[in-house]
């Protein structure tokens, strides 16, 4: 559940930080938290000569609001990260006030449909500042609200009726620094890549009675100063995705999953039903090749982890399993391709590729 990093082993110093959630222990200020861990990983990666960074927020369901503001501050000089508003109250702008920047180089953020809450805040802020390119699902989960929980057992003295349960209610909404809410709409990726859930209904918008999307006044912020032509980089990535046979197969798989899930009429005739099963089995086998995909990339742990791997077989096995997963990760592969574009050709000039 903690942040950790890895390095892609090739000519370019492209690094990856995986952040599974925005964790903090408010009862113990000296304990590990997401901000200090990410900051430490950045320092270690820079010591290895990092040229570009991928921050992986896929499946990150959120966490501490404080840590997301602090982590956002690692990538900008200073400024607002998110706005919060309660009913009948003025908006509150939460800002990074530290002028130091821990990483000012190329940054790509990976998201998916399960990136929610604090993950959306960070991705949205970096997108609004034009500080990072967001790659992933069509949109993130779309949870732009804050809930509080009241233990009803504490409300009733001398309760003899058993567990009274809890009462959960929404108290606030998050807003991007550009004024738009992340509620329902989430964060729309700059480069949309298909996955098996692309056409499946999920997210806050698919829950019962979700609060609507709205917008408020934008915060006062300044775009990140950079010579990078982000739109050209985004267009190049989109072109790669459009021409990728693997991405086409992933999209076909997603449409097939949607078709199967949407079917609600089944024939009672055995031969018709059996024919349908065989067709589904045949179609399913067409997508099995996706499991065998290899990017050709290799990943390695940082030097500080090597002694840990020697002394802890479980830790070593977990790292090796993660690296094997990254080698098959077509989305990570494209994120690293974008980093290469940003590093070698930030102004978006035409590239001439020489082949032997």
Residue ranges of model-derived segments:
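Low-complexity, polar-biased intrinsically disordered regions enriched in Pro/Ser/Thr/Gly
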Residues: 26-31, 151-164, 312-315, 319
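Short, functionally important structural connectors and interaction interfaces within domains
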Residues: 68, 73, 95, 141, ...
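Polar, glycine-rich mid-to-C-terminal structural blocks
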Residues: 130, 137-202
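Short, solvent-exposed mixed-charge patches
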Residues: 354-356
